[in-house]
Structures are given as C-alpha cells and as structure tokens.
Amino acid sequence: MENSALSNCVRRTNFSNQQRTMQEGLEESSWTMYFETEDGLGHYDDSSMMSDAASPMGCVEEDTASSPSNRTEGYSGMEDNTIEEKTMNNGKIEEKILNKNGIKIEEYCAELKKRGLCLVPLSMLSNYIG
C-alpha cells in the first residue's frame, strides 16, 4: 500500500512537472510569436518609433550672441577666468593679464616671490619628500 501511495505521489509530481514544462513552453512560444510578428512588420520609420537623436538634422544657425566675432575688441577671455588686455602706448604694445579681481598676475607672482613663496610641481615635492 505504501508503494502505491508513493508511486501515486511520484506520478502526480511527474504530471505537475510536465504540465509546468508545457505551460512554460506555451509562454515562450507566445513571446517568440510576438517578436516574430514585430520583426515581420518591418515599419520602423513610424514617427513614434524614431527618437530625436535618430532624426535627421536641419541646418544649424549660429548663435550670434555667443559667436566669437561679437566679442569686444581688445579683450579675450582665457580659460582660468583671466582677461588679456592689449593696449598701445607710444607705438609699443603692452599686454596685461588680469585675473577676475583686476589684479595683474605678474604683480601677484612678484608679491609671492618677495614673501618667499613659489609654486612647485606636486611631483617634484613628492620626489623630494619620498
């Protein structure tokens, strides 16, 4: 009797495993059919399917407010927020490089040297210490 109960339990387990496998197979095939139909349609040029990045670009007009041709003559902005000013005195061109506070950089460096401070590359300092 125990054998029949055990075999009955095994049969139910096998049947439920087969049924689960069949259900998984049906789910997989339904997804496969879905993808095959989408691939078969082949109309990807629909506006809802095309992103802005994939759309063709028209002519890009230059922004005249930020174009380099509209900068004030005599001044040019540099990367580290300094301004380079070119002036003409007695036929001689002088260049002053000012930081954003209006202090000449040469004078600032001279003041540091007077105080005994100088700029040293970090690698040179690490080689000296290490």
UniProtKB/Swiss-Prot annotation:
Region (Disordered): 45-81
GO BP term (any one): multidimensional cell growth
Organism domain of life: Eukaryota
InterPro entries in the cross-refs: VUP (IPR039280)
Miscellaneous notes: Plants overexpressing VUP3 exhibit severe dwarfism.
Role this protein plays: Involved in the regulation of plant growth.
PANTHER family (UniProt xref): VASCULAR-RELATED UNKNOWN PROTEIN 1-RELATED (PTHR33974), VASCULAR-RELATED UNKNOWN PROTEIN 3 (PTHR33974:SF9)
Protein name, UniProt field: Vascular-related unknown protein 3
Organism of origin: Arabidopsis thaliana
Lineage: Eukaryota, Viridiplantae, Streptophyta, Embryophyta, Tracheophyta
